[in-house]
């Protein structure tokens, strides 16, 4: 595929899903007290970043696209922090605050580029404001060109079938980063982007390449998908489409420092590409390059359009 400079300045992408505040606590001094077998981490740096669907919106903005993010947050300090982190000229945060819920927060403690432990503060959203969520989606789809549903199984997309139906009526491409053991609820989507582990939870463990290919083709048919993209970390990604041979995109690097947020990078680039007018094959090619860059970084890292173009034109 011919290399060229790309830009997503005209991309308009609506992102809906579970909003997460990602916190990183860095330690330069980590040791274990032998008498108590107690690990001690002296924290010297704290970093906070948008996570989940919020990271998708940020990724789109960082590569030059325009995103609107719709989702739930709690009426708490973490919710306010997440709002501030989404203060970007290319992000329009349309967040719904809920009194009864805390903002979903994940804290990762790291030392020497290794993750020691992750602490999750979360509960599924049970709200009377779902009708407001759907109203916001409907009004937004008259302007935005592509819909991304970022599902982390925290309750925002509890009725994902309804959202898919709404978007299909308006002929809007629907890209979904799926979660859980029920992929049937995503039937009729334009594209699903599970990682290999999520894919195998649905189709069974794949011990050979041909099993991945056969089961991918079958899943596209069973779920009536326009396409399925299985992301495979250091092994790249594989695209399945009805009545077409699978296309494999090898990773640029065979090592992965941290795959956190790589799926967000993939779906962000694909959404921005489709909203700009690129083909799905081109979009996946760009996404594979972007993911290969991001997995070399630690944490929920975003990619810039300059970084992407630099690697594309090496």
From Swiss-Prot:
SUPFAM superfamilies: Ribokinase-like
Pfam families: PfkB (PF00294)
Keyword list, A-Z: Kinase, Transferase
GO terms of molecular function: heptose 7-phosphate kinase activity; heptose-1-phosphate adenylyltransferase activity; phosphotransferase activity, alcohol group as acceptor
Keyword flag Translocase: no
GO cellular component term, pick one: cytosol
Enzyme class, spelled out: transferase
EC number per UniProt: 2.7.1.-
PANTHER family (UniProt xref): BIFUNCTIONAL PROTEIN HLDE
Family per similarity comment: Belongs to the carbohydrate kinase PfkB family.
Protein name: Uncharacterized sugar kinase BUsg_057
Higher taxonomy: Bacteria, Pseudomonadati, Pseudomonadota, Gammaproteobacteria, Enterobacterales
